[in-house]
């Protein structure tokens, strides 16, 4: 089984592909630019890239972060549009679509639903894959890459895999 984990964002959607045995097949981010593209163009770009990832890698399930927006209704509306486009792609390709909240993912994966993002990234680095230090910002002058979106996507896919007991090592 191949699982595609997504941390949805218009500017930088983090993604990863893992097998049910937690073998990492790939990870990256899909970046769009608000100065070059409209909101709808950006949604279209991301949805098409996700569609290609699903088709090329024979993905069985897509798991995305279910986000809550207490403070910014506009961001919530935009991400809801993006989520709708991804759900449409999954339905069109007959691929299972699932959601986990960040708190659920942290609790399932590490046992601590309140663990901060950098703590979850450290857990993933130590137990699964090291894609570099956790960073919310890209600083080209210091060669620091933004890894937060990718680590967040790993938290979602690994937690969903663990929750569904798809990896036999979880059952030991």
Give the positions of each predicted feature.
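Phosphate- and other anionic-substrate recognition elements at nucleic-acid/protein interfaces
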Residues: 1-172
């Amino acid at each position: 089984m191949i699982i595609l984990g997504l941390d949805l964002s218009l500017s930088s959607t983090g993604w990863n592909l893992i097998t049910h045995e937690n073998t990492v097949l790939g990870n990256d981010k899909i970046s769009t630019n608000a100065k070059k593209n409209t909101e709808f163009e950006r949604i279209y770009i991301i949805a098409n890239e996700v569609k290609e990832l699903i088709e090329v890698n024979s993905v069985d399930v897509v798991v995305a972060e279910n986000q809550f927006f207490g403070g910014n209704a506009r961001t919530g509306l935009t991400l809801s549009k993006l989520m709708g486009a991804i759900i449409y792609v999954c339905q069109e390709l007959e691929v299972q679509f699932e959601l986990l909240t960040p708190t659920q993912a942290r609790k399932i994966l590490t046992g601590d639903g309140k663990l901060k993002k950098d703590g979850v990234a450290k857990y993933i680095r130590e137990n699964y894959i090291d894609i570099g230090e956790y960073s919310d910002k890209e600083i080209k002058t210091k060669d620091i890459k933004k890894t937060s979106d990718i680590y967040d996507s790993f938290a979602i896919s690994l937690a969903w895999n663990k929750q569904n007991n798809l990896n036999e090592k979880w059952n030991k």
